[in-house]
């Protein structure tokens, strides 16, 4: 199958690219490939609004129908041939393109050991898993003090859970914010039981 625009990834950058494409080309075929099981959604809600604002998963899905996008869920692109303008997916199917965007986003670092109770929080499926754990567990360890780690810690705490945060930096958001703000956040989290 050939696409005028082939996008690898299903996050916010990919969705924004589709909006930009449709702003200049209403007819060109678009194929979006993502390894996720869910259609594109607003990722920030996973660590905030779904926990504290009474939102549901139905509130976060992005409308893909109006943009005429062929959405390939649970599909990983394993090879890119820039010379021949083609990609191969994880079952060996080849797709060609005129323009390619790789917008896969980042993935959390993995620990050198595993457990069913370790969640590398990034996807709607990760949200579902963590939400299910909150039904049976009271104590949570959040590794990471950046945006997602601090949002998850805050959301869990606001839902009455005991939360411990661990991070290699000197404070919450230390790699993101000025020292004064990071120090304030440390105090704020500690004052609120984290």
Q: Which residue ranges define each predicted feature?
A:
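Amphipathic alpha-helical segments in well-structured domains
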Residues: 127, 181-182
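FAD-binding core/adjacent interface of flavoenzyme oxidoreductases
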Residues: 1-6, 62, 66-141
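Glycine-rich Rossmann-fold phosphate-binding loop(s) that bind the pyrophosphate
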Residues: 9-12, 122, 144-146
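Helical element adjacent to the flavin cofactor pocket in flavoenzyme catalytic cores
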Residues: 61-71, 185-194
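N-terminal Rossmann-fold NAD(P) dinucleotide-binding loop
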Residues: 14, 149-150
């Amino acid at each position: 199958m050939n696409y005028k625009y082939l996008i690898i990834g299903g996050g916010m950058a990919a969705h924004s690219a589709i909006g930009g494409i449709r702003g200049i080309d209403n007819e060109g075929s678009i194929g979006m490939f993502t390894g996720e099981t869910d259609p594109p959604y607003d990722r920030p809600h996973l660590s905030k609004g779904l926990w504290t604002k009474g939102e549901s998963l139905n509130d976060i899905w992005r409308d893909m129908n109006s943009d005429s996008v062929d959405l390939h869920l649970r599909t990983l692109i394993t090879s890119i041939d820039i010379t021949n303008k083609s990609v191969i997916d994880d079952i060996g199917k080849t797709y060609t393109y005129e323009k390619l965007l790789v917008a896969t986003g980042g993935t959390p670092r993995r620990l050198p050991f595993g457990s069913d109770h370790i969640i590398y929080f990034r996807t709607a499926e990760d949200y579902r898993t963590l939400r299910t754990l909150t039904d049976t567990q009271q104590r949570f360890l959040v590794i990471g003090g950046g945006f997602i780690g601090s949002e998850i810690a805050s959301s869990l705490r606001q839902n009455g859970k005991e939360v411990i945060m661990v991070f290699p930096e000197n404070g919450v958001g230390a790699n993101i914010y000025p020292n004064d703000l990071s120090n304030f956040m440390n105090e704020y989290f500690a004052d609120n039981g984290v």
